[in-house]
Amino acid sequence: MLKQLVSGTALVAATLGSSLAFADDDARSSIHITANIPTQQFHVQPRNPDFGKDETMSYNTVSGTLTSLRQTFDVKNTEGSVNAYIEGGPASLYNGSDAIALTTAFNGVTLTATPQEVVDDATSTPGTQADMTIVAATPLATQNGLYTADMTVIFDAVPRVNP
């Protein structure tokens, strides 16, 4: 009986050992795929699909300023113009105690909490490109540390008004 138990245990160990050996040879790759296909009637999308995920404003030690951000967007509204605004109003870089104001403009229009036209009907109907720029105020000499900001820019399709 003991011989059978030892033989059975050895067989199980050999089987598990070979399974574990096969597991060491496995290779896995996780793949996440996203496809965003805009409508033919309305879209506002950055040319760089990674824009806004992790942007960095570098500090220039000579001038004491932060670099600005700039991104080109593809814009189209076949039914009218395009308005934009910043949800909650203009954002600031914040480190927990100090804030550095950010000025965000789209197509040359400074964005606020109030929706305003950023691309007119005639320009948006065939489709166009427009730049978004984000510029930080010059930090004070006492403002140092890691600053972060999160903001959401909302683009609205404004229907054409026929007189």
What is each stretch, according to the model?
Residues A10-L11, A21:
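Cleavable N-terminal signal peptides
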Residues M1-T9:
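Bacterial N-terminal signal peptides that target proteins for export
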Residues L16-L20:
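N-terminal signal peptide c-region/cleavage motif recognized by signal peptidases
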Residues A113-G127:
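An anionic, turn-rich surface loop/hairpin at beta-sheet edges
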Residues N95-V109:
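Short, surface-exposed beta-strand/strand-loop-strand elements in extracellular ectodomains
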Residues F22-Y94, T125-P163:
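N-terminal small/polar-rich segments of proteins
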Residues S97, T112-Q116, G145:
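Glycine-centered loop/turn motifs
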